[in-house]
């Protein structure tokens, strides 16, 4: 039976930081747990003047490299009723170690940054089957092909141009990533220039932007203080047959001190508007979709003095469902599908 699979697109434009999780997924080199992520709240102190006004700005300086650990945790539960009943539970944790090297900062504080994803560790399970992959350690060619997207991203530097308010103006110099991906997949000599452009755009959109959007957040141009709010309208996205408009809303909750630095804490939330017809017919199958429900919340710690995110955590929950009906020689066949996904993103400056 043909069945439309519900695909959830991670909402990468919200940031936040929780305060009660700690996990240790893998041991790193020399006994150091490079992949150990910690989402517990930073232990900040009270600032003498928490009501002062300030600017939120990125302040990268040439020669001062920065490393981040970005962790993505996905839990997906799917229930399908058709000829049979099927439940599936998929979990995946991916940890990225990213080096940022400021190459140039111009007079308008636009920074050219060279980024290198040094390594990626993936732990996943689908129902009772588990697997793991760490870039740079596997010698199994079939395993590398299976995880080509991760393998190609690792140790192939690329560049971005970033405004002082966190807007990514350009992503470029991704040729090494594209070429490595095509080589691993065996397409290096078989794709024409047009198809290579398509692959390049897909790598930027699905491989790089989700990670970059966790480290670089759009900040307000105006001066802010405690209780200040600002928002950004995101590009319209398509989920199945629906168009979704999303607005990220931020609010400064406090100004505190961490290791003698002034740190701004701000909450993030998401407002969504979903439009589109709920009914869809494809090759004789009639589908009725419920509009997706999306919620997101969290907190971010931003070092006002150094102009960098210190820590953040994103919690995004998405629920979608649909029913289907089709005619057959034995009468009508009906089915239903529901899917609930929670995605957590943790960013740590290390």
Model-flagged regions — what are they?
Residues 1-5, 18-20:
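Positively charged n-region of N-terminal signal peptides that target proteins for export
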Residues 13-16:
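C-terminal motif of bacterial Sec signal peptides marking the signal peptidase cleavage site
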Residues 19-350:
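Signature of exported/secreted
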């Amino acid at each position: 039976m043909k069945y439309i699979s519900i695909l959830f697109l991670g909402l990468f434009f919200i940031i936040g930081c929780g305060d009660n999780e700690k996990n240790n997924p893998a041991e790193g080199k020399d006994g150091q747990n490079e992949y150990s992520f910690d989402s517990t709240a930073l232990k900040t102190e009270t600032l003498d003047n928490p009501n002062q006004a300030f600017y939120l700005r990125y302040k990268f300086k040439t020669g001062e490299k920065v490393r981040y650990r970005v962790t993505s945790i996905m839990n997906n539960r799917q229930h399908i009723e058709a000829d049979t009943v099927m439940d599936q539970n998929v979990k995946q944790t991916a940890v990225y170690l990213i080096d940022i090297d400021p190459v140039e900062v111009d007079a308008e504080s636009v920074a050219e940054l060279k980024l290198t994803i040094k390594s990626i560790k993936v732990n996943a399970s689908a129902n009772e089957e588990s697997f793991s992959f760490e870039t740079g350690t596997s010698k199994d060619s079939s395993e590398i092909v299976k995880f080509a997207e991760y393998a190609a991203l690792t140790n192939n530097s690329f560049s971005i141009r970033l405004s002082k308010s966190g807007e990514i103006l350009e992503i470029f110099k991704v040729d090494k990533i594209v070429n490595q991906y095509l080589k691993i997949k065996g397409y290096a000599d078989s794709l024409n220039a047009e198809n290579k452009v398509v692959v390049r755009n897909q790598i930027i959109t699905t491989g790089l932007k989700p990670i970059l959007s966790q480290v670089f957040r759009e900040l307000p141009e105006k001066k802010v203080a405690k209780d200040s709010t600002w928002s950004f309208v995101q590009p319209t996205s398509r989920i199945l047959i629906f168009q979704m408009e999303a607005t990220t809303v931020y609010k400064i909750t406090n100004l505190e001190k961490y290791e003698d630095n002034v740190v701004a804490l701000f909450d993030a939330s998401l407002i969504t508007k979903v439009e589109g017809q709920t009914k869809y017919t494809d090759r004789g199958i009639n589908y009725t979709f419920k509009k997706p429900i999306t919620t997101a919340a969290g907190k971010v710690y931003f070092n006002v003095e150094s102009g960098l995110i210190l820590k953040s955590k994103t919690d995004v929950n998405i629920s979608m469902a649909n029913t289907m009906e089709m005619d057959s020689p034995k009468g009508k066949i009906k089915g239903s599908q529901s899917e609930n996904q929670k995605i957590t993103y943790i960013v740590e400056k290390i």
